[in-house]
Amino acid sequence: MSKIIGIDLGTTNSAVSVLEGGESQIITNPEGNRTTPSAVAFKNGEIQVGEVAKRQAVTNSDTVTSIKRHIGEDGYKVEANNKSYTPQEISAMILQHIKSFSEDYLGEEVEKAVITVPAYFNDSQRQATKDAGKIAGLEVERIVNEPTAAALAYGLDKTEQDEKILVFDLGGGTFDVSILELGDGVFDVLSTAGDNKLGGDDFDEKIIDYMVSEFKKENGIDLSKDKMALQRLKDAAEKAKKDLSGVSSTQISLPFITAGEDGPLHLEMNMTRAKFDELTSSLVDRTKEPVRQALKDADLSQSDIDQVILVGGSTRIPSVVESVRKETGKEPNKSVNPDEVVAMGAAIQAGVISGDVKDVVLLDVTPLSLGIETMGGVFTKLIDRNTTIPTSKSQVFSTAADNQPAVDIHVLQGERPMAADNKTLGRFQLTDIPAAPRGVPQIEVSFDIDKNGIVNVSAKDLGTQKRTKITIQSSSGLSDDEIDKMVKDAEANAEADEKRKEEVDLRNEVDTLLFTVDKTLSDLDGKVDEEEVKKAENARDELKAAVEADDIEDMKTKRDALNEIVQNLSVKMYEQASQEQQGDQAAQGSDDASNASGDDDVVDADFEEVDDDDNDNQ
């Protein structure tokens, strides 16, 4: 059965996801981006979709954007390329583009899809969306409400109690607020409100207007009349908006934006977040009324809402987040990428349809090995596959660097020797480890699985007794098919895995050797012949060069050579130390005979032991 993809067909941007190994994976477009502009351009008889179309939205009049606003609108057509196109046809071109690069990613033909729509879409809008899919060569298995898809991606279907969820969706071109009631895994849309003429594009326009106004004040030229300049302003405004979501100010620099009487002119401007908030405050205010309306329509108050989740890239704007916080009285859940969350939920719904997503029956044995990632990306098992539960296991680990203040515990499930090839169950950190050389702190990692298959993992510093833990429920884990696949993968890749593990072990061994050599050379300073030390330093540098060159065979050769030199140095140091002790003994007076006798017993024992070692070596 071919894969069913999940598509978020957005007003400004679209995204596509597929279920792989039980998790939604966003499929990147040919430009390597995780979202694709919902734009279509016609140029020289060619249809261009996505990034390339967006870049000519201002300069090419045959470019169509935000077609989703008109889908299902009776009689509406756009004129482009000397033809008339329905919204379904334009949407189909976007879907065809998505279908094409999804097939390239999956390496197989894609025939089926789940497509999301706003909760307020009526039947004709939903049917038009299905028709667009059909035109694109896709069988639309299901039309899913965007807020429901978002809630699925946030994992809210797995909550045990009934919940009321407010979904705040501010995309590039539209704004929606939906309130869902969730009970027994069923989503019910209680109310929906919004503004389909409000989105991130409007925030961009405010910045563009400000730049045009400021440039006109300084230079007397209206950039809005220049299409090429306007396209550059549009790109710069979008970048500034994104920058100001993370930093308090950003520099807008557009050299050679236009030309005046005295030659070329440049636009240089610093924009602060405070200025951005001032320019866009009216837009943020417009998001408040739909939130209040949705609550009123659902006959709910702020206190009735259990969770608020954010959808759409524009929800990254700090002033928007603050407004949501005030209007709902809740801290918004921002744990999933807002640009991708709807597509990811659509892929989960696709998995439900194909039977890949279902409740996992808790077994009385652990289906796969459990462990943690250790130095070099190795998967160290603590509990083996098919171990009867309940069970528990502990193992002591240490730090990988001097004065390491914390350790990251990466909990994994699977059968492959390398951590990256197994499934991540969770991560947590043990902090405040007292400063000490590497290898000294004792960190005890414990796995405990109870009869319900719930995994508790803890890490304890045996020195300070400080402890942290994480709880992982197996119902969010792997299906039987995934387990079979992982076991087969482990068998099929055994040889390659073993080679990679050997390489990691070699690197760890070399790293430890280099650390030991540096310490030994420091201890030997002035105690052995300088030429011998130089020889060791050269061998050490050669090994470092082999590591940098990533030459495994050369690393082995240089490692063995360095080991031999260091061992010889150590022997010479002990011989020298023994001779010095003998000299000290001979110089002692007879008055100290009784004391010397006691000391001689110790010295002789040490000396004889060294002699034995020398004889063995000879």
From Swiss-Prot:
Protein encoded by which gene: dnaK
Keywords, comma-separated and alphabetical: ATP-binding, Chaperone, Nucleotide-binding, Phosphoprotein, Stress response
Family: Belongs to the heat shock protein 70 family.
Coiled coil: none
Residue spans crossing the bilayer: none
Compositional bias ranges of the Low complexity kind: 576-597
Presence of keyword rRNA processing: no
GO MF term (any one): ATP binding
Record's keyword annotation contains ATP-binding: yes
Listed Acidic residues bias regions: 598-618
Function: Acts as a chaperone.
Signals that turn on the gene: By stress conditions e.g. heat shock.
Residues where Phosphothreonine is found: T174
Pfam families in UniProt: HSP70 (PF00012)
Protein's name according to its UniProt entry: Chaperone protein DnaK
Ranges for region Disordered: 573-618
